[in-house]
Amino acid sequence: MLGAFFLILVLFLISQGLFSSLAKKHAFFSRKLMNQLFWYHIVFLGIYYSYTIFNRSDSKAYFDRPQRQGWNWFDFFGTSTTFIDFLSYPFINFLGFNYEMMMVLFAWMGYLGFVYAYLFFRENIPVKITVFKNFDLLTLILFFPNMHFWTASLGKGAPIFLGLMMFA
């Protein structure tokens, strides 16, 4: 568990470097908003992790399968759900990540999907739409809880969302 907290801090710092680069390229980029979104997403990581303690979750299988004896990394390469095992294999077997650390890593992938979604929509819809007399619609949409829940865990949601938003 301690490794997961350390990884959260490391990924937060890496995010700051990414934000510096993005802020140079995009005048509209808001580091403050992205930092708030980071911690909001981490809250959903905690919620999803709590959910997995008391309920069945695919994330447990995605953590267990890459540790099978007699399987190597490229045995998991493919276009099915085994691709998630392929992505997680080096972190579990070479870097020694535990379940909680894998949850954090994939939650960060999901978070990066939100960063790229923000860039995509802010670039392509430059008009700020205000709702409820006070709130920017894009900001409000970024904080909808459903996508945060499903992209804050070891699973398909985070890498799919990241990939979609990176190449949108």
Predicted regions and their residues:
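Transmembrane alpha-helices of multi-pass, membrane-embedded glycan-processing enzymes
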Residues: 10, 92, 96, 103-117, ...
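Short acidic/glycine- and proline-prone juxtamembrane loop motifs at membrane-interface regions
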Residues: 153-156
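Membrane-interfacial segments
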Residues: 22-27, 51, 55-56, 95, ...
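Membrane-embedded catalytic interface detector for glycan/lipid assembly enzymes
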Residues: 143, 149-151
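Extracytoplasmic catalytic/substrate-binding loops of multi-pass membrane glycan-assembly enzymes
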Residues: 51-65, 74-87, 96-97
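Transmembrane-helix motifs of polytopic, lipid-linked glycan transferases
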Residues: 17-22, 104-126
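Transmembrane-helix signature of polytopic, membrane-embedded enzymes
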Residues: 28-32, 117-143
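Start-transfer (signal-anchor) and selected internal transmembrane alpha helices
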Residues: 1-43
